[in-house]
């Protein structure tokens, strides 16, 4: 059903291209996963271009759980322990301990403060002491290999940032409806049109990456 709903956004490969163009222009994109998986739409932004307004929109229209997606290398660089040793969550979502910027924030909750935290975590020369633990931003560690290894929003966000030419750090937040329920594909499409955001699926991104690797090979 998702593919039919999304046909107005172009073919699967066109949807990825449009998403990459939007990210390069400093906009956000909506990423849907499989209807048989979480069946959720996440707002995704590149960490290094995200604005306070975009963070505020994520908090206002999202679940409130703002996540910064990072690689294993960056997790080690920041010395962030995983939230639990034995991950029993359904999709093995790889949360680390939560973080707060050590400088430049007040309570850490506002959109500006959360963006400051994201920027501190994304800085090239970021070090463990730049972040306090716990905090109000939730790092997620992506699997090496991206969506070709794990078809999750975390990996999709890192892949999109990288393919768009940015460092592999991205911000995501699940879109929710006004009544607090999770937004599914029809609501995601409506929201995306209202906010001029492209929509793509993780399936689209897998197809795009496989095509790119085939061309490279």
UniProtKB/Swiss-Prot annotation:
Please give the biological process terms from Gene Ontology that the record holds.
riboflavin biosynthetic process
Q: Which Gene3D superfamilies match?
A: DHBP synthase (3.90.870.10)
Site feature location: Essential for catalytic activity: 136, 174
Q: Give the binding site residues for D-ribulose 5-phosphate.
A: 37-38, 42, 150-154, 174
Quote the record's cofactor note.
Binds 2 divalent metal cations per subunit. Magnesium or manganese.
> Please, which domain of life does this record's source organism belong to?
Bacteria
Quick check: keyword Manganese in the entry?
A: yes
Q: In the UniProt record, does the keyword Manganese occur?
A: yes
- One Pfam family hit: DHBP_synthase
Q: Which cofactor does it need?
A: Mg(2+); Mn(2+)
This protein's pathway reads: Cofactor biosynthesis; riboflavin biosynthesis; 2-hydroxy-3-oxobutyl phosphate from D-ribulose 5-phosphate: step 1/1
Q: State the function annotated in the UniProt record.
A: Catalyzes the conversion of D-ribulose 5-phosphate to formate and 3,4-dihydroxy-2-butanone 4-phosphate.
Instruction: Give the protein's recorded name.
Output: 3,4-dihydroxy-2-butanone 4-phosphate synthase
Source organism per entry reads Proteus mirabilis (strain HI4320)
